[in-house]
Amino acid sequence: MFTQIKNFLVLLMVITIAFPSACKTKYPPLRIGNSIGIKDMNYERLKAMKDAGIDCIEITTGGFISTKKPKTDAEITELLTRTKLAADSAGIEIWSIHMPFGKDIDISQTDEKIRKNSVALHMKVLEFCKILQPKIILFHPSWYLGHNERNERIAQLVRSVNELNPKVKELGAKMVIENMLGYELVRNEQHERPLGRTVEEVKLIMKQLPKNVYSAIDMNHIDNPELLIQAMGKRLKSVHIADGDGRHECHYMPNPCSGKGDNNWIKILKELYKAGYTGPFMYEVKTSEYKEFKDLYNCYQNLYQNFIDSNK
């Protein structure tokens, strides 16, 4: 009897030790990424990110697409070449490019002249993106809308996506469309919220887009983002990680790391794994939310461990 009890206790100990390892095999940790403006790109900064455990970046394009201080093509080429060299030297992958957005460069514009000009600008940016060799190119579906024009805007978005997607494919990248903030339809007397404001609207839009155009989900833009992850499934190819209240552009560090925000990160991670998501855990938080890059790494490790513990 004593031998049987001893064997049972040994077996129990083995199972207890092995379970966390098995759990981590089933749910391998994601790489960690961070959004960064191109003006902040230099080797020293990127090396500090890499040393802190950050493997990937998303580059925002506002730094070289500016109507106030436009750069020449030669200046942009030189800037992006230096950027790519710095990333490669630091061992950082350029995962994604966040394309420019704004009222006058809205690819859903019903004014066909503005839409065509917007597409032309995006085409030019994509040509420059060849230098950076990203895996993902992220687009906003729209700027703010006028009242009662959502169906027309969706049709214009679909038209623009069909024009831009072949260019994205030339780069060997995937095109993704981001969900937008919009807990209420109406913003003010002049405007409605952008396209992609609810789970239902994102589903409606994605059904009309080519199958090789994918979804990006901003966890700060919607209440219960796990429901949108669930709806997108394997069509989800990139994320923006931040916490918030689903009503404002908060861009907090995830709660509990910040003590702010309503997101349930255990549910979010659960749905990411169910969707087969293998891209990076790409932060898009305010720089005031962390003191050093290691805070981003430590926050993810905290969230990941909480998720693993929830599966025991």
For each feature predicted by the language model, list its residue ranges.
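Catalytic-core regions built around general acid/base machinery
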Residues: 76-89, 160-170, 231, 267-271
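N-terminal pre-domain/capping segments
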Residues: 2-5, 22-131, 135, 151, ...
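Hydrophobic core
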Residues: 13, 17-18
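Conserved residues at the C-terminal ends of beta-strands
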Residues: 60, 98-100, 140, 242, ...
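Active-site acidic/histidine proton-transfer and metal-coordination neighborhood
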Residues: 88-90, 105-214
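Short, flexible/disordered intra-domain loops and linkers
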Residues: 65-74, 185-195, 253-255
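Histidine-acidic metal/acid-base catalytic patches
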Residues: 2, 24-31, 39-55, 116, ...
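Feature marks short, surface-exposed loop/turn motifs that line or immediately flank catalytic pockets
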Residues: 40, 63-65, 101-105, 143-145, ...
